[in-house]
Amino acid sequence: MRAEIENYIKKIEQSLDLIWRSLDIEALTVRLTELEELTADPNLWNNNANAQTLLREKNNLEEKLNVFNKLKSNLKEILELEAMAEVENDLETLNQIEQDFKKLSIITAKFETECLFSGETDCNNCFLEINAGAGGTESHDWASIMMRMYLRFAERLGFKTKIINMINGEEVGIKSCTIRIIGKRAYGWFKTESGVHRLVRISPFNAAGKRMTSFASSWIYPEIDDDIAITIEDKDLRIDTFRSSGAGGQHVNTTDSAVRITHIPTNTVTQCQSDRSQHKNKAQAMKMLQAKLYKLEMQKRNENVDKQNANKTDNSWGHQIRSYVLQPYQIVKDLRTNYETSDTKGVLDGNLEDFVSASLSMNNSGNKT
């Protein structure tokens, strides 16, 4: 038991040290004092836009500092309880303390990753698109496995999800889907997952038991706040309505409630069929279009648009971000960071935190996603 406790303590202390350096707590505290003085100025609201910017920054820094101090305080309290339990040889309390250290280790590691979030939309909700590659049944099944993986990942992080659009495969799985992920910092946690995913396994659909390779792609873009202006001209839009093709009961296919919107200049397409109301589906599809166009604009600014669009559209060997090998051995490897694990079951069950952390650490050198 003592060895496990020591291991958790070491992990927590290492995370807190990395957080201290990542946030630069001393500089953060100085900046927070400056912001408190600026936001106390009675003339602050003479410039509404500037006031909103300063308040957002102040609230963000206050939250980070409060979380850091609370983690330190929690560690101190548990260490004090552990010392008393050790003196009294209270095994029951020590068992509970071990679980407390485990929980604190998980929370601290999560906050350590969130300290790497630096984009202006990292705190927002986001949309996740999954598209099966060529290969019919195999890729459709792989796309559905990916959908489950990301739904479980969102659940692990405490996010809510809503399937906006889904097209089923002819035999199994899905051809494509769009999922709205709802929760604070959802985009920050998902943004590095855009790209092509390759699966190697013994096919359950091949009578000869051959090893097969399948591809599917994911693309993540942030939901846009009202204070971010995205101009879309009506003349640039083509709006089509159609009957829903997904599951949902007898009412789904009785009216043309599903909506597809095409932004003609960029050939960007969104569609929604999650509601029986055409009006609500149109509003959701328009919100998704705004988010996609914002993402494309950010990519252009970062001079990554060609690479990102390739990742989004070309489900092939040359644009992979991750490989999932289930036979003849088991390994999941990220081809950008070289991070890998043999826990394929855990990964496919949504355990993606370490992959995200590795990608964010690499991107933190200055690349934005």
Swiss-Prot record:
Pfam families: PCRF, RF-1. The keyword Protein biosynthesis applies. It is found in: Cytoplasm. Keywords: Cytoplasm, Methylation, Protein biosynthesis. GO terms for cellular component: cytoplasm. Gene3D superfamilies: 3.30.160.20, 3.30.70.1660, Release factor. Its main location: cytoplasm. Methylated by PrmC. Methylation increases the termination efficiency of RF2. One of its GO terms (molecular function) is translation release factor activity, codon specific. The modification N5-methylglutamine is found at residue 250. The keyword Cytoplasm applies. Belongs to the prokaryotic/mitochondrial release factor family. PANTHER family: CLASS I PEPTIDE CHAIN RELEASE FACTOR, PEPTIDE CHAIN RELEASE FACTOR 2. Peptide chain release factor 2 directs the termination of translation in response to the peptide chain termination codons UGA and UAA. HAMAP family: Rel_fac_2. This is Peptide chain release factor 2.
